[in-house]
Structure formats: C-alpha cells, structure tokens
A protein has these predicted regions:
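Conserved beta-strand-loop surface patch within small alpha/beta domains used
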Residues: 1-85, 96-154
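Histidine-centered divalent metal-coordination motifs
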Residues: 90-94
Length: 154
C-alpha cells in the first residue's frame, strides 16, 4: 500500500473531525503499485441503527457502514478511469488500531475477500490525537488478514 504523506494526513484529519464516531473511506489508484487517492465517505451506521437496531445493533462510535451510493459511485468512477480499489480505511475510537472480527466479516463475501488486493487501513484516534495506524491485507496462504506495511511517500 502506497500513500502520499498528504493523503495519509487527510485520513488523520477526517478521523479527528468525525470523532467520536468512526470515519471511513475508500482508496483508489491506477494500479495497486501506485500511490492511492483518498475518497472520504459518509458513515451511515447511526442512520441504520436508528431505523433497525435489531439488524444494526452498533452505533457509529463502534462501527462504520460506508454509504452504498458513495461506494458504488467511487468504484464505478475508478473502473471507468481504468483504476482499481486499493483499499478502505476507517478509524477506531479510543482504542488501538487492529483488524477486528467485525472488520474481517465486512471484508469478506462467501468466505473470500470481497476485494482481494485491497488493504484495510485502521487509524486509532483518541480525541484530537491519532495514536496509531496499521494496515491489513489478505494472505492467501494463511487465509486471513495480516499486517502489511504502508509505504509513505513524501
């Protein structure tokens, strides 16, 4: 995963701005080997929870759900330009950056990664302080998500 420092700072800024709710977004690039562009998305978890707390028991403070219209527009726009989805990002509120069981479940479709080449960036934010950032990618051999490096480009 390659990110320009400026783009990583955009993710940090969004994480702080949307605190105490989790933020979320999508990363795209011409190829998985090129620096990714950040696409901020709206976390609609609170709206879903308000409409159907049985199906969506968690609030945006501990969960995220990317607006499906934004997801479609960003993915379709990337494909139209010959680009690919290189990753997704979200923040964790007042806890460490880790890939939770819920994160894994959302990243999968029928026991396979929905976006096999995508990297999932998780930002740990406490108030206005970003404390940690980690990235996770699919490992076919272990059939699980594992830590991967973020290559930060100045």
């Amino acid at each position: 995963m390659k990110l320009r420092r400026h783009d990583l700072e955009q993710i940090f800024e969004q994480s702080r701005a949307e605190y105490p709710d989790e933020c979320c977004g999508i990363l795209t690039a011409p190829t998985v080997d090129e620096p990714s562009q950040v696409h901020r998305c709206r976390n609609i978890q609170n709206e879903l929870h308000a409409k159907d707390p049985q199906q969506y028991p968690r609030e945006a403070r501990i969960a995220y759900f990317i607006d499906p219209q934004q997801l479609y527009q960003i993915v379709a726009g990337a494909e139209k330009k010959g680009e690919v989805v290189t990753g997704f990002y979200h923040s964790h509120i007042d806890c460490d950056a880790y890939f939770s069981d819920e994160d894994k479940e959302r990243a999968m479709a029928w026991d396979e990664p929905a976006y096999p080449d995508a990297v999932y960036v998780v930002v740990s934010v406490y108030g206005d302080e970003v404390r940690n950032t980690k990235a996770f990618g699919w490992n076919e051999e272990s059939r699980d998500f594992v830590d991967v490096e973020i290559d930060i480009i100045d």
